[in-house]
């Protein structure tokens, strides 16, 4: 897979030891050192990504510097008769001279001949001194064909919740969630009450608006005074000349008859 010897110095160089009991997260430290004058990109992979958390699991090492990598084994039921076949691989390559904007793309586009790698075995040890035997020769022979995937980068505090000792925290979290639901329900009822109140006020405002419009219409019609007295007076003033004319005609006819 790689055509170059590993440029990084790994401590430990051949295996990672995890000391039990394994009822909680167990951490093994891995130190990576860059003795060269060039920047080196590194990535940590494993054949069991669901069983481990690695922080950091990738990065760039400046010349003449080192970094401590924490490899965290998640809690599990330890069986001393079961052979451990977990493997880790530290993969590296020289970083380009330009600024690396995306390490993911850098690894994706890297030619295979530029990659360097070192494989590490995992060994489980119990406090009494007995430890699980490393992988057999047959399993070592298949190391080259083992499937390595990047270890999931998780917060150790999140991983530790999987243990039974953390169950009270889960109960507390559930209780807190229940209180949050009650608060939300109370706020919802309060909001619904406010909406109902606003609807009532809106209805009152509509009724008031209709009443004001009616009053305005009444005021618009009423300015013309309905005083019937002037009209009859005008009629009285208009009628006398007509009466006089008629009376004069009648009087003329009577006088005419007498004269004839």
UniProtKB/Swiss-Prot annotation:
Membrane topology: Single-pass type IV membrane protein
Domain of life assignment: Eukaryota
Example of a GO biological process term: endoplasmic reticulum membrane organization
Region (Disordered): 127-177
MF terms in GO: FFAT motif binding
Cytoplasmic-side positions: 1-238
Protein name, per record: Vesicle-associated membrane protein/synaptobrevin-binding protein
Biological source species: Aplysia californica (California sea hare)
Lineage: Eukaryota, Metazoa, Spiralia, Lophotrochozoa, Mollusca
């Amino acid at each position: 897979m790689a055509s170059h010897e590993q440029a990084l110095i790994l401590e430990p160089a051949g295996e990672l030891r995890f000391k039990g009991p394994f009822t909680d997260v167990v951490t093994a430290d891995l130190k990576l050192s860059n003795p060269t004058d060039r920047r080196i990109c590194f990535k940590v992979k494993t054949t069991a990504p669901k069983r481990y958390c690695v922080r950091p699991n990738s990065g760039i090492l400046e010349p003449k510097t080192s970094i401590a990598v924490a490899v965290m084994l998640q809690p599990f039921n330890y069986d001393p008769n079961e052979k451990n076949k977990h493997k880790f691989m530290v993969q590296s390559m020289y970083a380009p001279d330009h600024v690396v904007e995306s390490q993911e793309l850098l690894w994706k586009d890297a030619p295979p001949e530029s990659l360097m790698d070192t494989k590490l075995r995992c060994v489980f040890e119990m406090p009494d001194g007995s430890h699980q035997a490393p992988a057999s020769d047959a399993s070592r022979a298949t190391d080259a064909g083992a499937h390595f995937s990047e270890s999931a980068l998780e917060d150790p505090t999140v991983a530790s919740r999987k243990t039974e000792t953390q169950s009270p925290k889960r109960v507390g979290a559930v209780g807190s969630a229940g209180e949050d639901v009650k608060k939300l329900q109370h706020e919802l009822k309060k909001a619904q009450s406010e909406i109902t109140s606003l609807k009532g006020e809106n209805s009152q405002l509509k009724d008031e608006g209709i009443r004001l419009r009616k009053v305005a219409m009444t005021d618009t019609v009423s300015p013309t005074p309905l005083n019937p007295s002037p009209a009859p007076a005008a009629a009285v003033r208009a009628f006398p000349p007509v009466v006089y004319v008629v009376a004069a005609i009648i009087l003329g006819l009577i006088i005419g008859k007498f004269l004839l």
